[in-house]
């Protein structure tokens, strides 16, 4: 069985849909992986037809409580890191985790042994890293990327 690439997305604009479409086309041309798109917005037919699985979940719960807001960081001009709850009005972590759980549950139920989870706004020019990660998953349970400061 092929590895599965799960793409989580929330494409509420044409521009975001086009970014997702570009990623799906890159994966479709590679043809070495099965592809699932999980989204809280409807998935256009032309995108869905190029996937192995498409999962639309209308429940897109956002957290608005002050104590549940995320603290995104940004570093303008690489001069000073700023971390604040006041950069947005809500936290989307619950919605994101819901897509991860739904995608992984479907993958497990269908018998996939290896899953690669990426966001819709990735641009994959070279799949070497995914092939390398697939080999690593023969030995390890998980491969995680972290930001080193």
Label each residue range with its predicted role:
Residues 2-4, 27-36:
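Short loop->beta transition adjacent to catalytic acidic/histidine clusters or analogous donor-positioning motifs
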Residues 38-44, 121-122, 147-149:
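Short beta-alpha junction loops
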